[in-house]
Amino acid sequence: SHRYVNENGNCPSCIAISTELDGPRQILATDNFIAFCPWASIYPYEFAIYPKKHSTTLTKISQKEIFDLAMILRSTLGGMSQVLNNPSFNLIFQLSPEKKNSRQFHWHIEIYPHINDLTGLEKGFGVFVNSILPETAALKLGAAARKEIAKIVGVE
């Protein structure tokens, strides 16, 4: 990513965000964050939450951004629970591994619901089969997440 940023002037995550904004894989967006299912999802219903503007660290976000992050996390996780019948999941904060935050790094959160057991292909060969298109997952998760927001703000 260092070379890419130096050659192109922006990070791959910023390009992905601009591509996904209002696209078929977007689940939900707030003023400051976007949740979407990656176009090459390995796992069914996996999704990520990114700050819309390039940001290298979670620790320097504003109060408004904290509120937006809480809102998008609560609504997408609540929507996922509704769609997938309360699955267990991994929630991973991808933060810069360097002591000095690299200007190339764009922090984000990845969510991996546990809905399938790994089969022989996954275990034996490292070949993952995702039976749910990311566009289909985003459509279902987005509808459920919007219902969650309506409940949160009292507009059922």
Language-model features: locations:
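HIT superfamily nucleotide-processing domains
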Residues: 1-156
